[in-house]
């Protein structure tokens, strides 16, 4: 790729950001712009005094309540009004008061006594798992099927030999898969972890009320399914350790077979871990591995039948971006199938949020820079432990969401009307290519609804499981506490990229903390803001530079501008992204609507007003564009509905104000008369076809027009929100630019490598506005999105995905429209 391509070459630059309009110095604001030392959240200053006072005196929010819409009966179970007030507890702080003994010797031996008094014994765990799995009907059928394929025309004797051969193979697989839990090993590991965690973590906080709900769930004699977010390898041990400390039996943990290494694998098996393949789909010859799938299914069914607890990581692998990744629902589908066969009466689902000040891996810069992932080995584990002992990784927070009934969730979904099945291509192409007649709004609506009514049971089942997985991950992500490193990294990258005085950073930190609490997210820290900020800066290490200035004897804090440091700061900054993600989407959509009019787009709206309906639809389309970046909203809500609610919050904050009646007179056509030139299909509306015709929605509605506040603090907040999505949108727009030079079919791994090299080169030559836009995660997500919306066709050649342009995007003009669409949201 030559340098001209890096500067966007011959592409129509009238739609591209002008570098002269961007100054990193815009990220730097004085303390006066954030307000005086009253530290009220800036966007709420226009609210009433009473509302502001209640905000400042608010208690910590209690996170993790289940969805009332999908599980109304579970909402009242395991919860009572006193639970939120039970407060936090540091799990690794143990002394003689946590044992039945007192005195000098008890103080010296408190760890040993505490571990010895935990309730763990052999009778808690599954027995005869291997034999029961091998004798299950599904496994027997799979063995017979595989044996028949090995010896299709053989005699009965040869067939018997083939069956025995397959059975031996099945036993070998189960030896790797089936865990043999050892109570003695759990106790020993508990004592070791108590020592280790105290050496490299300041504390591990849990909410006592949440643990009370989990304990109440264990008394139902139903299997529990723990579904945590996945940030670090420590996640595997952390949950088991916490449950052990509270006399709750250890769950069986699904682990990737990359951790099946000598000695370490034995430890994992003894603690309840069982290894599964990272890819279940195919055998080396390209066919489905019927035997392995049957064994895995039988193993999960047997554990649930014996009322064991399971722990599954829905993301499949550790998040390399700091955001909660999209769900991979393979194992979850096995759990749902088990319930549908009436083997067990019900399963209780418990999403789990885990937050670290600093993960023990430190960062994933190597993989984000495109280097291949190193395979785990005993030596790498030993080096990791030694490295951990040399450092302190700050605080950890684990949040257990309210348990909910899987049976109730499935029944509630079956009673809901089947909504339109919209693919990303159906949702976004009308916005990207509005002139395509086949994608007209009305036609898209009818087609999608007919497809949903004619959908097979299997497609509906897959959709149900995918929605369940998204529901769980959204709740787990919402439960994740915001850590001090998350806020400091976010402020340094997206408010003070050129540096800031420590005193101002502390003020802004306090403001951001209040903003987080106001959105019902909890914090993973407490104490004096200055101390907490210094703690975070210390943990961020070489990513932050501290210099002493002569002015007022002040310290000046600057984020490092090297690519690895920016990647690392972005990883921790993404820990706070989900707090503001919907507001950031509205802020970027606000820019898109206003910028379109500034470029002379067709509009009947006065220059100082914007259409709320147009803003909401524009934001809904951006939600679809970013849907590969994680779960943006609950699947029981449409993007249209969530965007509509977020615009309402902007009105509540005072960022947007509703135009006076006189201003709206004669300019607000009914919704039926409006023709958006980039209108999304009607199924994006949150109104159901089954709405009561007597309701207000049965009447003709008139659009609402809004004004944008011009106050400095509101404009600064909008800018901050827009910058949060800056790296994502720059990565997607750069990928769209790269598509202009696409030539011929190319293997997907090769294309990913070329695109990533292009983004890294832009960063190294200071062409990129956001260096963090070049992370490999964003490259993969952008290409996946382009496949989903129909830019690329994907074919398989020798088990390798090959990409080529679809007929829709063969014309250069359509690729240009894709680029223009993404750039319409980009603020520089």
Swiss-Prot record:
Q: Which domain of life is it from?
A: Eukaryota
> Quick one: which pathway?
Phospholipid metabolism; CDP-diacylglycerol biosynthesis; CDP-diacylglycerol from sn-glycerol 3-phosphate: step 1/3
Which amino acid positions bind CoA, per UniProt?
Answer: 278-279, 288, 293, 328, 462
Biological process per Gene Ontology, one example term: phosphatidylglycerol biosynthetic process
Cellular location(s): Mitochondrion outer membrane
Enumerate the residue ranges of region (Important for mitochondrial localization): 80-120
Where the record places motif HXXXXD motif is 230-235
Stated membrane topology is: Peripheral membrane protein
Q: What is its EC number?
A: 2.3.1.15
Q: What is its main location?
A: mitochondrion
Reaction(s) catalysed by this chain's protein:
sn-glycerol 3-phosphate + an acyl-CoA = a 1-acyl-sn-glycero-3-phosphate + CoA; (9Z,12Z)-octadecadienoyl-CoA + sn-glycerol 3-phosphate = 1-(9Z,12Z)-octadecadienoyl-sn-glycero-3-phosphate + CoA; sn-glycerol 3-phosphate + (9Z)-octadecenoyl-CoA = 1-(9Z-octadecenoyl)-sn-glycero-3-phosphate + CoA; sn-glycerol 3-phosphate + octadecanoyl-CoA = 1-octadecanoyl-sn-glycero-3-phosphate + CoA
Q: What is the effect of changing residue 101 to E?
A: Abrogates mitochondrial localization
Q: Which cysteines are joined by disulfide bonds?
A: none
A Gene Ontology molecular function term for this protein is: glycerol-3-phosphate O-acyltransferase activity
| Impact upon substituting residue 102 to E | Abrogates mitochondrial localization
| GO CC, one annotated term | mitochondrion
Quote the annotated effect of residue 233 to W: Abolishes catalytic activity
Residues recorded with modification Phosphoserine = 380, 688, 695
Which ranges does the record list as Cytoplasmic topological domains?
A: 1-87, 119-828
Describe the effect of residue 118 to E: Abrogates mitochondrial localization
The record's section on SUPFAM superfamilies has: Glycerol-3-phosphate (1)-acyltransferase
Q: Domain comment text? A: The HXXXXD motif is essential for acyltransferase activity and contributes to the binding of the cysteamine moiety of the acyl-CoA and the phosphate moiety of the glycerol-3-phosphate.
| Physiological role | Mitochondrial membrane protein that catalyzes the essential first step of biosynthesis of glycerolipids such as triglycerides, phosphatidic acids and lysophosphatidic acids. Esterifies acyl-group from acyl-coenzyme A (acyl-CoA) to the sn-1 position of glycerol-3-phosphate, to produce lysophosphatidic acid. Has a narrow hydrophobic binding cleft that selects for a linear acyl chain. Catalytic activity is higher for substrates with a 16-carbon acyl chain.
Q: Which family does it belong to?
A: Belongs to the GPAT/DAPAT family.
Q: What is this protein called?
A: Glycerol-3-phosphate acyltransferase 1, mitochondrial
Please give the organism.
Homo sapiens (Human)
């Amino acid at each position: 790729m030559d340098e001209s391509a890096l500067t966007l070459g011959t592409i129509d630059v009238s739609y591209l950001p002008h570098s002269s309009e961007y100054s990193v110095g815009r990220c730097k604001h004085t303390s006066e712009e954030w307000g005086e030392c009253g530290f009220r959240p800036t966007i709420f200053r226009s609210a009433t005094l009473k509302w502001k006072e209640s905000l400042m005196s608010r208690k910590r929010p209690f996170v993790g309540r289940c969805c009332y819409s999908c599980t109304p009966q579970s909402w009242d179970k395991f919860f009572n009004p006193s639970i939120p007030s039970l407060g936090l507890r540091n799990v690794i702080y143990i002394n003689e008061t946590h044992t039945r003994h007192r005195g000098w010797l008890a103080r010296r031996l408190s760890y040993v006594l505490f571990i010895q008094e935990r309730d763990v014994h052999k009778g808690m765990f599954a027995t005869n798992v291997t034999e029961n799995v091998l004798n299950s009907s599904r496994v027997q059928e799979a063995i017979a099927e595989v044996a028949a394929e090995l010896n299709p025309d053989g005699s009965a004797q040869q067939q018997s030999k083939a069956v025995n051969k397959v059975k031996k193979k099945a036993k070998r697989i189960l030896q790797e898969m089936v865990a043999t839990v050892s109570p003695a090993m759990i106790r020993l590991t508990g004592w070791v972890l108590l020592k280790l965690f105290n050496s490299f973590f300041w504390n591990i906080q849990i909410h006592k009320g949440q643990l009370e709900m989990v304990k109440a769930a264990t008394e139902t004699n139903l299997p529990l399914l723990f579904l945590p977010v996945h940030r670090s390898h420590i996640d595997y041990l952390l949950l088991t350790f916490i449950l052990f400390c509270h006399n709750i039996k250890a769950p069986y943990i699904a682990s990737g077979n990359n951790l099946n290494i000598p000695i370490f694998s034995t430890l994992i098996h003894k603690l309840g871990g069982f290894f599964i393949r990272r890819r279940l789909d195919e055998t080396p010859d390209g066919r489905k591995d019927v035997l392995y799938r049957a064994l895995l299914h039988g193993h999960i069914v047997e554990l649930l039948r014996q009322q064991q607890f399971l722990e599954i990581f829905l993301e499949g692998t550790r998040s390399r971006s700091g955001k909660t990744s999209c769900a991979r629902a393979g194992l979850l589908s096995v759990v749902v199938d088990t319930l549908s066969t009436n083997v067990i009466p019900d399963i209780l689902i418990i999403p789990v949020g885990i937050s670290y000040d600093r993960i023990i891996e430190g960062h994933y810069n190597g993989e984000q820079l495109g280097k291949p992932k190193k395979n785990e080995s005993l030596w790498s584990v030993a080096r990791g432990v030694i490295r951990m002992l040399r450092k302190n990784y700050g605080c950890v927070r684990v949040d257990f969401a309210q348990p909910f009934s899987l049976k109730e969730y499935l029944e509630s979904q079956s009673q809901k009307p089947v909504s339109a099945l919209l693919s990303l291509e159906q949702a976004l192409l009308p916005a990207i290519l509005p002139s395509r007649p086949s994608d007209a709004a009305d036609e898209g609506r009818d087609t999608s609804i007919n497809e949903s009514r004619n959908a097979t049971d299997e497609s509906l089942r897959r959709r149900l499981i995918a929605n369940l997985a998204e529901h769980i991950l959204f709740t787990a992500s919402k439960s994740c506490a915001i850590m001090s490193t998350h806020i400091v990294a976010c402020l340094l990258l997206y408010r003070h990229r050129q540096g800031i005085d420590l005193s101002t950073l502390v003020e802004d930190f306090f403001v951001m903390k209040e903003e987080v609490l106001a959105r019902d997210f909890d914090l993973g820290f407490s104490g004096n803001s200055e101390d907490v900020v210094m703690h975070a800066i210390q943990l961020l290490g070489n990513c932050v530079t501290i210099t002493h200035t002569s002015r007022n004897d002040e310290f000046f804090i600057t984020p490092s501008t090297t690519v690895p440091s920016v990647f690392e700061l972005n990883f921790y900054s993404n820990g706070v992204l989900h707090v503001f993600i919907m507001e950031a989407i509205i802020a970027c959509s606000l820019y898109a609507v206003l910028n379109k009019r500034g470029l002379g787009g067709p509009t009947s709206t006065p220059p100082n007003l914007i259409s709320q309906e147009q803003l909401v639809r524009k934001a809904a389309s951006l939600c679809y564009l970013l849907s590969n970046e994680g779960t943006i909203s609950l699947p029981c809500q449409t993007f249209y509905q969530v965007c509509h609610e977020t615009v309402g919050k902007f009105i509540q904050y005072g960022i947007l104000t509703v135009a006076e009646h006189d201003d709206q007179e004669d300019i607000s056509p009914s919704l039926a008369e409006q023709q958006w030139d980039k209108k999304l299909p009607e199924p994006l509306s949150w109104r159901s076809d089954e709405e009561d015709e007597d309701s207000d929605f049965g009447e003709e509605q008139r659009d609402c027009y809004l004004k944008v506040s011009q106050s400095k603090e509101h404009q600064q907040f909008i800018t901050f929100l827009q910058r949060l999505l800056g790296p994502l949108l720059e990565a997607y727009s750069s990928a769209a630019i790269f598509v202009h030079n696409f030539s011929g079919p190319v293997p997907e791994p090769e294309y990913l490598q070329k695109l990533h090299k292009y983004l890294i080169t832009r960063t190294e030559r200071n062409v990129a506005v956001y260096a963090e836009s070049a992370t490999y995660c964003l490259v993969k997500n952008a290409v996946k999105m382009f496949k989903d919306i129909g830019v690329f066709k994907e074919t398989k050649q020798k088990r390798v995905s090959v990409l080529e342009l679809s007929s829709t995007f063969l014309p250069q003009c359509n690729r240009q429209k894709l680029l223009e669409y993404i750039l319409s949201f980009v603020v520089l």
